[in-house]
Curated annotation (Swiss-Prot):
PROSITE patterns: MADS_BOX_2
Location of the MADS-box domain: 1-61
Main subcellular location of this protein, as a coarse class: nucleus
Gene that this sequence comes from: AGL29
Known function: Probable transcription factor.
A GO cellular component annotation in the UniProt record: nucleus
Coiled coil start-end: 86-123
Keyword Transferase tagged: no
Organism the protein comes from: Arabidopsis thaliana
Protein name: Agamous-like MADS-box protein AGL29
Tissue expression remark: Expressed in pollen.
Amino acid sequence: MGRRKIKMEMVQDMNTRQVTFSKRRTGLFKKASELATLCNAELGIVVFSPGGKPFSYGKPNLDSVAERFMREYDDSDSGDEEKSGNYRPKLKRLSERLDLLNQEVEAEKERGEKSQEKLESAGDERFKESIETLTLDELNEYKDRLQTVHGRIEGQVNHLQASSCLMLLSRK
């Protein structure tokens, strides 16, 4: 039996509303945690229960996220940023950051192309040898080398994903 689609309207029964709030709050905080982990983002969420009790989640913590928000956007709340020119230094910093990230991406692309050329020129001889003829020690050594390569690949993927998230955030 599959899940039913629930209409988006306020739940009338107070007990059901409280249960729904608790479950959805947990899901919201879980998604926020995943976003923070995947994109190396700092984030903060504050929600109030139907009874008026506040719940918060912050990564790394809500205080540091709120402090950073207030520090960076304190001047922009006045609505006079175009007149005062306060947006220009921020825009310049973001533009410089974007340029640096673009340079990193280009460097990584070049590194990837060079690595690809090395792999193609090597002819994948390492992977052609028959593993049936290897001793237990040789197999363990081979396994360790593969795990090392796998770890480096995962690290590079995580670095590129974080850079991509930063680029997307800096464009907004």
